[in-house]
Amino acid sequence: MAPGTAELEIDETLHLLRMVMQREFIHYLETLPGTKELFIDKCLLRPLDMIATSSDMKRHGVKRIMHFDLQKSPQVWNIEIDQRVFFLRPNVENARKIVEYVEESSENRSICVIWCNRQLEECDLAFESSGVIGHITQLSLNMCLLPLESDLFSLQHVESAQPDLFSVANMFVALQNLYGVIPTVYGLGSESKNLWNLVHALCSSNELRARPDQPISHLFLFDRQLDPVPVLLTGASYEGLLHEFFTIDCGKLAFPVDLRKQVQTGPLDFDWIEINPEEDKEAHQQNRGDTVKLDNCEDIFASIRNKHVTAALEFLHSKAKSIQKSIEKSSMIDDVADYRNFVEKDLRALKKDHKHCELHINACEMMMNKVKMEDYRTMFKLEHEMLLGTVTHEEYFDFVFERVPMRSCRDVVLSMMSLASLKLDGVPDDTYNEFVEMYLQKYGYEHMFELQNLRNSRVIYARRHIAHDRTISERARTWETLARKFRIVKGNEPMDMSNPSDMSYVFGARISPLLCKIVEDTIDHGWNQAEYERIIGKDKVLVEENTYIAADRRPDNRTRKAIMVFVNGGITYWEVAALRLLAIQKNFRILICTTHVIKKREYLEVRAKDASSVFGS
């Protein structure tokens, strides 16, 4: 196979997945008669923007496209609109809001809900209890892998303590229906094994076939809970810090106003969204000019996205000086034709690059100013020493308890307590009791359910809780054993951050992401099934061979086929950067796929509130 051919085939594969979803969505619009008003869930705006264009939707009867807002009353039905269509995530809150829309509409108007990814029984019960289930058409549309980058794909699930295995399994069925069975599949974790069993169950009536031109040679399936440590640590790669500080959403980022003050306002981020003049004007402003697309098409960001933040800043300053010199050279051009040629071809691009440089320099400096603060330096040190096992409990927990009263440090407090719970196989009982008392005094006793939920989610727990749930201790021991096997925790060895030699650079040369080390070990030595079964358990290790090549053999990069790594439950940008370095070092194409990209704050908040709906409205 000629170089580059496999890459084209891979891109086309995932592009076809998107085309299938687009056709299904358009088919739904075609089958709904009359003119339509489309309401879109806020978290689905950007994913839908990558699937169907406004012109596609308007050609199929969509007259208006609106935000779906839980806080606002149903709008008056426009006389020109025959049907309202809602594209929403399935949850009870959205279902209850739909009930309000049905109750406000007249009998001759139709309402359709397209659930992404599937119709849930809880939503049906909400409709049924309100007596409106017969007035609503319900459809479901499974989200495909969306390309956030040429090597990074996401199902754009919302953060959840319970990953949606059904929609993930549907995606793998669609992938293999289009391009044949994946030859070799590895999996670690009970959810990974359950996921692949579900894939086989969904294919039972339509047996998948192998194809020689399948562009993916190996698939790695990982459970997020197998290694929660990268979520809890603060890394140092530029793209990862951008996500933690500002949030990258579907490949786009909204920089704060103070970082954009010297950047000209661009076009509407969603030019197909119509904002009613009666609606909140603030929402209108939020969609104007404050987003930047972050991908490899923008050369400057492509050069720094995976760099350590210090190396990124150094590169940006050097690049800015180089751009400025190129602009100043124009003053030495005497020939009018040459000067006109420079203005037409080079000047605009140079000014654009200079603007991007300035924006990223401002972002780098702002993030580094925070990271260099005494609190952050101490936190990095204590996290590292906790993982090494060299920190004293008194020093570690004194630092945490001093920050409990500081509301701005809530994420730091929860993440450090979670790290201690995992590493120490439960926080000492007296220390845990002291933490609970301080936390409730600061935030109020109505937050006691948050701590209960964090305990039930196995995020923060005391040693006494292990007696009631042995699986908590098993998870901690499994992580500790794998961490020792792959030597993921480093000492204080120096590393050139501008030219890193090891994946640990994403955490300041302190720790390598465990899941990435497992992929590296398989590339170097092959899959060690017996060892994984000994450490994790036979019921949590998956190996499937759909080829004559033995699964325990090392992947061969001479085949020009890709390795797909899928993390169920989300991946961090730290791990993405580490896998990209691994791909370069081993000369493999690695497709990084996931349910969503994790942000530490959302990860902790969701697990703190996961069961609180039981006590809520």
UniProtKB/Swiss-Prot annotation:
A Pfam family per the record: Sec1
Principal location class: other
Keyword Nucleotidyltransferase found: no
Source organism, top-level taxon: Eukaryota
Entry membrane topology: Peripheral membrane protein
InterPro entries registered for this protein in UniProt: Sec-1-like_dom1, Sec-1-like_dom3a, Sec1-like, Sec1-like_dom2, Sec1-like_sf, VPS33_dom3b
Keywords in alphabetical order: Cytoplasmic vesicle, Differentiation, Endosome, Lysosome, Membrane, Spermatogenesis
Compartments in which it is found: Early endosome; Late endosome membrane; Lysosome membrane; Cytoplasmic vesicle, Clathrin-coated vesicle
Family annotation (SUPFAM superfamilies): Sec1/munc18-like (SM) proteins (SSF56815)
Keyword presence, Transmembrane: no
Disruption phenotype: Hermaphrodites exhibit sperm-specific sterility and only lay unfertilized eggs. In contrast to wild-type animals, mutant males produce no or few spermatids in their gonads, but instead their gonads accumulate terminally arrested spermatocytes that do not bud and contain four haploid nuclei. In some instances, the spermatocytes have small buds that do not form spermatids. Oocytes and unfertilized eggs contain some larger endocytic structures tethered to yolk granules.
Tissue localization of expression: Broadly expressed in somatic tissues including the pharynx, intestine, spermatheca, and in coelomocytes. Expressed in the lining of the gut lumen.
GO BP, one annotated term: intracellular protein transport
Record GO cellular component, one term: lysosomal membrane
Protein family (similarity comment): Belongs to the STXBP/unc-18/SEC1 family.
Role: Plays a role in vesicle-mediated protein trafficking to lysosomal compartments and in membrane docking/fusion reactions of late endosomes/lysosomes. Believed to act as a component of the putative CORVET endosomal tethering complex which is proposed to be involved in the rab-5-to-rab-7 endosome conversion probably implicating sand-1, and via binding SNAREs and SNARE complexes to mediate tethering and docking events during SNARE-mediated membrane fusion. The CORVET complex is proposed to function as a rab-5 effector to mediate early endosome fusion probably in specific endosome subpopulations.
Subunit structure, interactors included: Probable core component of the class C core vacuole/endosome tethering (CORVET) complex. The common core is composed of the class C Vps proteins vps-11, vps-16 and vps-18, and which further associates with vps-8 and vps-33.2. Interacts with spe-39.
Protein name: Vacuolar protein sorting-associated protein 33B
